[in-house]
Regions:
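Acidic, low-complexity N-terminal propeptides/linkers enriched in Ser/Thr/Asp/Gly that mediate export
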Residues: 1-153
Length: 153
């Protein structure tokens, strides 16, 4: 395994599951989860526009030890998970830099506050938008969105 994905994997394996804003692990996990789900849906022939939002339940189904999700993964979900980590880490390196330990969840996970109409007016839009970096994720009470398309994009 190349050094960068290996370092990211080490971080994930030592992670306590906290989605703290200053940590790289939730960012790596979110990008990996998106990559696993995208690759599984693509491999099963599900058109991108028809793909449901990824859920923790479907990810658990794919990665269950009894291989119940193998059809979605081309027969080997562990291999797909490894390829997804490579893809996720490459994508993050392009936007966050080369060192996975220096990445931060709050670089892409923000609470955004903006006026529903004024945001479309060129001069007023930026003046009526506030963003605050935040921790948490879609599976916690501290829910927030992604900046610029998410951790994988």
């Amino acid at each position: 395994m190349p050094a960068r994905p290996a370092r990211a994997l080490d971080l994930l394996l030592a992670w306590d599951g906290s989605a703290a804003p200053d940590r790289p692990e939730p960012l790596i996990f979110a990008a990996w989860r998106e990559a696993v789900l995208a690759m599984a849906f693509a491999g099963a022939g599900v058109a991108e526009a028809a793909r449901p939002a990824g859920t923790a339940e479907f990810l658990a189904f794919l990665l269950h030890p009894d291989d119940r999700g193998a059809w979605w993964c081309g027969g080997d979900c562990a291999a797909l998970a490894g390829r997804a980590l490579d893809r996720a880490v490459d994508g993050l390196a392009a936007t966050q830099g080369a060192d996975p330990a220096a990445w931060r969840w709050d670089a892409l996970h923000v609470a955004r506050f903006e006026h529903p109409l004024l945001r479309f007016i060129p001069i007023l839009g930026p003046l009526t938008r506030l963003e605050a970096p935040t921790g948490g994720d879609g599976e916690t009470v501290n829910r927030g969105g992604y900046r610029d398309g998410g951790p994988g994009g």
